[in-house]
From Swiss-Prot:
This is Son of sevenless homolog 1. The gene is Sos1. Signal peptide: none annotated. The modification Phosphoserine is found at S1078, S1082, S1120, S1147, S1164, S1196, S1215, S1261. Residues 597-741 form the N-terminal Ras-GEF domain. Promotes the exchange of Ras-bound GDP by GTP. Probably by promoting Ras activation, regulates phosphorylation of MAP kinase MAPK3 in response to EGF. Catalytic component of a trimeric complex that participates in transduction of signals from Ras to Rac by promoting the Rac-specific guanine nucleotide exchange factor (GEF) activity.
Length: 1319
């Protein structure tokens, strides 16, 4: 028995695990009920759980045996009126329990645990009663905190928010912290600093929207809490009495709600290209309707001289005080002192309108909006002059600021100012002890002088929301050096939640007095100098004491109204979009925190997606953008327009049988309900349908250009829309359509103005107009790069998101669906082939070296112009099979240009890590490499299912579309900035008409290129053939510096190797295997074969060029060793390296014919850029450690790159990010050279083609020079592959004397690193 009587410890080590987390899921559900647009983090819900368990402990201490015992405990322990509401909820729960479970908290589990807590079996009904009380208090806490969070314009409830909000709520503080002296809340300095500086137009609009929402809540408080008791008791207060006190407050409330709705609609419908929301028309329309006139008559009534006397006379009527006291504790005092101050708030708010309109007119960047503001200001001149005249007579005498009339805290307007004020006050008080003011208060209310009855001297009072500080003035200067110079000396301080305010009538001893009653029964009486001063102090003190009670009264009233006036929707049979949400038609993301409190859709039916696209409760602009970008993958444009029209045409709900009987009797039961339905459902839905239409024609007009019938239907639909609220949106859509039609008929117009003039066109040997002489060596390399950059920039900027979604560029209708993307693919492939052709058709070695050198100069200018697509085109050409094998040519390329080429190749290594870092570090304009986007889109499309199945229903996987839209959004962010360069029409035309293949088929052309390569540099180790010169003009390059640099002309962006401080690639770990911008992971496809070995470490998608990522494929004569290889530990177990495609075993032939590989024809667009097969473990072309032969040229070239765009792969490889490797013995039908890809090191090698040549051997590199030593390199930190190690031996220079004394490298040889150490 003794053990049972010991108090139960909820938070002990033994019991805490039983309760921890028990209530959190239910609390999350409760929070969703009271504030559906907010989110709560786990810490916040766990803190609420602790509070509820604390409350449960308090209820269980009374050892309840029946519901009446619990009720009695609640009445004794809970503050009024929360006890009354909690009991009412509990009783309701017991009654409903017989029919269904109305509770969110787990009543059954709590009932089971209560037997252990109490030590005896408790009746189930008592448990339900207790749980209902707990749920009510939890809802009350979350409702209070949610209001605070919305007030500070946040979207997530945190633990700190709960502490701050509860600290300002006397009711909850009394309940949970009755015996705690003071509660420490974090200082406001932890919050983000307040923004200082000049506000923009959009800042003003956002601030005003938040302010008017709070203002509307104040009006609701006046009307629903204070005015309602006067209206409901016609015996005490006549309608004339109510009119005299509250004047036209209802009209003002209606105007405020209408104004907020107009502004919200305008902000929602604002075009992305607009500088800011154009809210001028909102004020102009209402001003022309004379909607602001009630403010003038209201101010006249409230500020008339006899108003206060009449107001007090109403309260002094017989029975009035008793009636008001019966409504709630302190309600009579709140009416007497708080209501008069609240009634002044509309006056100050109206005066604020006039100031706001002037500020908005000044900040507006739109001429039409400025004109609307002027018209609104002019229309309000009469109201403004009348208001100012009334206020100048009355408000000046009252000496009240606007903040004094505010019921709700405005601390977030200037938190830093509040902190500064608190700190200044505390420093000015001598003898301060205890915690700082800022640790127990959030807001400074007021200060002034009061007389404490019985004291000799006056007290200077500082009133905060949590403290009342009474000080005595320090008279005279300090006598001793170092003594405090504070102006005040602390006498006493009162915690506002621990005191009771009592009004005192005037007596002979004191006048204008009030009493502060402490919890221990002692009291202090203060008197003011006048009745007006007393009213000011009482208004502030009563507001602090009863603010939470009044807010709860408002919330209860609003909730009750919502229950009584539930909006009735049409039946789902009549209106398909009225079907309730369920798991069979819509799913939401569970682990994603929405930023604006709007749920994020994971999947849904088309109808549900359209419903949420035009939802009546909130707007979701991100969803609108994503939907219009991706909808074509699951819905045709004609179907979308039909659904939008169906959504727009909303039928009104049919009357019930009771409604029909009432109508027959002459009543109008549906009038109020229909009015609400039209206002809260029909109007917002129709506006959002128009908003979707406007976005559609503005940003996706190509849908209408491809289908004239679609455009005609849209225009007919817009023409049928009626209603004043819709007028300006209809006009906006009509203007957009007309503008788009004109642009379509006249062609694209470019009217771009640059800050500086573009640079002059550079010429070399060829001259303007002589297009027949244009060639790689006759045109200036700077101008070739510039004109190609302009051309590729135009092609890149022309690609629309719809050409990418659903991988439509790989589908049957690609010419229709992806015309601009295919143009870019074809241009890039043609340019790459042209570079290859220029090189291999130049037979003479000296001229060929000049051609390669000129191409590298073009690459250098590409880098300076941030044309990454062009850079990778050049790299691809240099890495192609016909060019890659030209060893003798690359030997004569200057080392500086080799370094430039190697650095360019490094952009594609390690999953394009350096390219992505470079792209993020530069400023537009630029031409990004498109292939990486297409790869990411293809992986996302193919790695995620089109639909999700739930309960036998198929839901559109919108999460997948959202990921694709994020990629297209990244593409679009680089499409806005054009180049400040001058178009040279002839050069542009020359490159637009490039056709290196002529009439040849691609297989035939690639065979020709490779055979030509073999002709100019044969495989056999014999003297290089001599060829006559092809060109009669000088081969010397004009260089890559502009010939006429002028001040103010465009300077090329700094090339990669010249800006090590912007981005140092040496600081990027080469060992990382994941790209920083890899595509979203997707599920493994069921047909994907597992890796051949668990030792594979490079299965990610890699370079588009299929060349060695760890060593340069170029012909560097420096002793460069792969930085990847060198990073391996020396104690690693030697593992045979994967077989490089360029190496052949002794028994295998050395060459493969390209004619056996290429099988695609020119009728399908070629892909860009071509690529080489690559692997992380490929050895460098001239590696120190594995090149043992000094006689043989390099091995046979890599596999030829395909020229086709990607076909949708059937399945992916073991990782969802990889394309499936080709089957054994069959060449992969790449068709997707435009996509970065890397074969697995364990992919079976391609079939070998017999060759008459012998075994290939490796050529050694020249010796490592002192300048190239790792510790002596003084240049920028890129590229890392130029690093060397002291462990690498120095080898003799390469010679071309053919010797067959060295063994060739076999597939089972040791890795590079081990070779290096062993040699």
């Amino acid at each position: 028995m003794q053990a049972q009587q010991l108090p139960y410890e909820f938070f002990s080590e033994e019991n805490a695990p039983k309760w921890r987390g028990l209530l959190v899921p239910a609390l999350k559900k409760v929070q969703g009920q009271v504030h559906p647009t907010l989110e709560s983090n786990d810490d916040a819900l766990q803190y609420v759980e602790e509070l509820i368990l604390q409350l449960l402990n308090m209820l269980c201490q009374a050892q309840p045996r029946s519901a009446s015992d619990v009720e009695e405990r609640v009445q004794k322990s809970f503050p009024h009126p929360i006890d009354k509401w909690a009991i009412a909820d509990a009783q309701s729960a017991i009654e409903k329990r017989k029919r269904r479970n109305p509770l969110s908290l787990p009543a059954e589990r709590i009932h089971h645990l209560l037997r252990e807590v109490l030590g005896y079996k408790i009746d189930h009904q008592v448990s339900v009663y207790i749980v209902a009380v707990l749920e009510y208090i939890s809802a009350d806490i979350l409702k209070l905190v949610g209001n605070y969070v919305r007030n500070i314009r946040h979207y997530e409830i945190t633990k700190q928010d709960i502490k701050v909000a509860m600290c300002a709520d006397k009711v909850l503080m009394d309940m949970f912290h009755q015996d705690v002296e003071d509660i420490n809340i974090l200082s406001l300095t932890d919050e983000e600093p307040s923004t200082s500086g000049e506000q923009t137009y959009y800042d003003l609009v956002k601030a005003f929207m938040a302010e008017i929402r709070q203002y509307i809540r104040e009006l609701n408080l006046i009307i629903k809490v204070f005015r309602e008791p006067f209206v409901s008791n016609s015996k005490l207060f006549s309608s004339n009495d109510v009119e005299n006190i509250f004047s036209r407050i209802v009209d003002i409330h209606e105007l405020s709600v209408k104004l907020l709705g107009h502004i919200e609609d305008t902000v929602e419908m604002t075009d992305e290209g607009s500088p800011h929301p154009l809210v001028g028309s909102c004020f102009e329309d209402l001003a022309e309707e004379l909607a602001f006139d009630p403010y003038e008559s209201y101010a006249r009534d409230i500020l008339r001289p006899g108003f206060h006397g009449h107001f007090l006379s109403q309260l002094s009527k017989p029975g009035a005080a008793l009636y008001l006291q019966s409504i709630g504790e302190g309600f009579k005092e709140a009416v007497q002192y708080v209501l008069p101050r609240l009634l002044l708030a509309p006056v100050y708010h109206c005066l604020h309108y006039f100031e706001l309109l002037k500020q908005l007119e000044e900040k507006s960047e739109d001429q039409e909006d400025k004109e609307c503001m002027k018209q609104a200001i002019t229309a309000l001149l009469n109201v403004q002059s009348g208001m100012e005249k009334i206020c100048s007579k009355s408000l000046a005498k009252r000496r009240l600021s606007e903040s004094a009339c505010r019921f709700y805290s405005q601390q977030m307007k200037g938190k830093q100012l509040a902190i500064k004020k608190m700190n200044e006050i505390q420093k000015n008080i001598d003898g301060w002890e205890g915690k700082d003011i800022g640790q127990c208060c959030n807001e400074f209310i007021m200060e002034g002088t009061l007389t404490r009855v019985g004291a000799k001297h006056e007290r200077h009072i500082f009133l905060f929301d949590g403290l009342m500080i009474c000080c005595k003035s320090n008279h005279g200067q300090p006598r001793l050096p170092g003594a405090s110079s504070a102006e005040y000396r602390l006498k006493e301080k009162f915690f506002m939640r621990k005191v009771q305010i009592n009004d005192k009538d005037d007596t002979s001893e004191y006048k204008h007095a009030f009493e502060i009653i402490l919890k221990d029964g002692n009291s202090v009486i203060f008197s003011a100098k006048s009745a007006e001063e007393k009213n000011n102090w009482m208004a502030a003190l009563i507001s602090l004491q009863y603010r939470s009670t009044l807010e709860r009264m408002l919330d209860v009233t609003v909730l009750q109204e919502e229950k009584e006036e539930q909006m009735r929707l049409p039946s789902a049979e009549v209106y398909r979009f009225a079907e309730p949400d369920s798991e069979e038609n819509i799913l939401f993301e569970e682990n994603v925190q929405p930023k604006a409190g709007i749920p994020i859709i994971k999947a849904g039916t088309v109808l549900k997606l359209i419903e949420r696209l035009t939802y009546h409760m909130y707007a979701d602009p991100n969803f609108v953008r994503t939907f219009l970008t991706t909808y074509r993958s699951f819905c045709r444009p004609q179907e979308l327009l039909s659904l939008l029209i169906e959504r727009f045409e909303i039928p009104e709900p049919e009357p019930t049988e009771a409604d029909r009987i009432a109508i027959e009797n002459g009543d109008q039961p549906l009038s109020a309900e229909l009015k609400r339905f039209r206002k809260e459902y029909i109007q917002p839905v129709q506006l959002r349908v128009l908003n979707v239409c406007r976005h559609w024609v503005e940003h996706h007009f190509y849908d209408f250009e491809r289908d004239a019938d679609l455009l005609q239907r849209m225009e007919e639909f817009i023409g049928t829309v009626r209603g004043k609220a819709m007028k300006k949106w209809v006009e906006s859509i009509t203007k957009i359509i007309q503008r788009k039609k004109i642009a379509r008929d006249n062609g694209p117009g470019h009217n771009i103005t640059f800050q500086s003039s573009p640079p002059t066109v550079e010429w070399h040997i060829s001259r303007p107009g002589h297009i027949e002489t244009f060639d790689l060596l006759t045109l200036h390399p700077i101008e070739i790069a510039r004109q190609l950059t302009l051309l590729e920039s135009d092609l890149y900027r022309a690609v629309q998101p719809s050409e990418l979604v659903g991988s439509v560029w790989t589908k049957e209708d690609k010419e229709i669906n992806s015309p601009n993307l295919l143009k870019m693919i074809r241009h890039t492939t043609n340019l790459t082939l042209w570079f290859e052709k220029c090189i291999v058709e130049t037979e003479n070695l000296e001229e060929r070296v000049a051609v390669v050198s000129r191409i590298i100069e073009i690459l250098q200018v590409f880098q300076e112009l941030n044309n990454f697509n062009g850079v990778l085109e050049v790299v691809s050409a240099m890495n192609s099979s016909p060019v890659y094998r030209l060893d003798h040519t690359f030997e004569q390329i200057p080392s500086r240009q080799k370094k430039i080429l190697e650095e360019a190749h490094e952009l594609s290594e390690d999953h394009y890590k350096k390219y992505l870092a470079k792209l993020r570090s530069i400023n537009p304009p630029c031409v990004p490499f498109f292939g990486i986007y297409l790869t990411n889109i293809l992986k996302t499309e193919e790695g995620n299912p089109e639909v999700l199945r739930r309960h036998g229903k198929e839901l559109i996987n919108f999460s997948k579309r959202r990921r694709v839209a994020e990629i297209t959004g990244e593409i679009q962010q680089y499409q806005n900035q054009p180049y400040c360069l001058r178009v040279e029409p002839d050069i542009k035309r020359f490159f637009e008409n490039l056709n290196p293949m002529g009439n040849s088929m691609e297989k035939e052309f690639t065979d020709y290129l490779f055979n030509k390569s073999l002709e100019i540099e044969p495989r056999h180790p014999k003297p290089l053939p001599r060829f006559p010169k092809k060109y009669s003009y000088p081969l010397k390059s004009p260089g890559v510096r502009p010939s006429n640099p002028r001040p103010g002309t465009m300077r090329h962006p700094t090339p990669l190797q010249q800006e090590p401080r912007k981005i140092s690639y040496s600081r990027i770990p080469e060992s990382e295997t994941e790209s920083t911008a890899s595509a979203p992971n997707s599920p493994r496809t069921p047909l994907t074969p597992p890796p051949a070995s668990g030792t594979s470490s490079n299965t990610d998608v890699c370079s588009v060029f299929d060349s060695d990522h760890s060593a340069s494929p170029f012909h560097s004569r420096s002793a460069s060793v792969s930085s990847i290889s060198l990073s391996k530990g020396t104690d690693e177990v030697p593992v045979p390296p994967p077989v490089p495609p360029r190496r052949r075993p002794e028994s295998a032939p050395a060459e493969s014919s390209p004619s056996k590989i290429m099988s695609k024809h020119l009728d399908s667009p070629p892909a860009i850029p071509p690529r080489q097969p690559t692997s992380k473990a490929y050895s460098p072309r001239y590696s120190i450690s594995d090149r043992t032969s000094i006689s043989d040229p390099p091995e046979s070239p890599p596999l030829l790159p395909p020229r086709e765009p990607v076909r949708t792969p059937d399945v992916f490889s073991s990782s969802p990010l990889h394309l499936q490797p080709p089957p054994l013995g069959k060449k992969s039908d790449h068709g997707n050279a435009f996509f970065p890809n890397s074969p697995s090191p364990f992919t079976p090698p391609p079939p070998q083609t017999p060759s008459p040549h012998g075994t290939r051997r490796h050529l050694p590199s020249p010796p490592l020079t002192q300048e190239m030593d790792l510790h002596s390199i003084a240049g920028p930190p890129v590229p890392p592959r130029q690093s060397t190690s002291q462990l690498i031996p120095k080898l003799p220079p390469k010679t071309y004397k053919r010797e067959h004394t060295h063994p060739s490298m076999h597939r089972d040889g040791p890795p590079l690193l081990e070779n290096a150490h062993s040699s």
